[in-house]
Amino acid sequence: DLYNEPGGSGGYRYGERSLPLLQNIFTWGRTVNPSQPLSAGVWDMSLTNLNKFQLENSDVITYHTYEGLDSHQRLIDTLKQYGRPMICTEYMARTQNSTFQDIMPMLKKENIGAINWGLVAGKTNTIFAWDTPLPDVTEPSLWFHDIFRSDGTPYSTEEVECIRSLTK
């Protein structure tokens, strides 16, 4: 992606005011005659103008969602109309009912690439959900993200087996 989460996220949102920057980024990207596809991932369906530009100008459709199976499938069905390859650049949030066992089989069936950004529990603290107060740093019973503990053992052997079976 040339631009992650156009419109902003977290504490401050630029919203549709990010459109001129997004347009410039694609112009700059095209001027170097890239050998790789250009994209900017859709992430907030309320940003209508940004999404329209992203979807019309991306060589491959990238998106992210942390929603569960049904919502994720609806988003895929919407994005299919662009007739381009798709990559889900962020997904899987156990605390939001978005799990490897639910989402990965659907992505495989739909022939959609997937990027999992959390791998090993560590300094990024992605075992904890975003914007969640941490009274202490005790390991939560339900991790938000990540697959392995820092010693290399899996958080869930069932998840690891699911991932292995789907990626062979």
Q: Could you say what each language-model-derived stretch is?
A:
Residues D1-T157, C162:
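Extracellular glycoside hydrolase catalytic/binding regions
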Residues I163-K168:
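Non-catalytic accessory regions flanking glycosidase/transglycosidase catalytic cores in CAZymes
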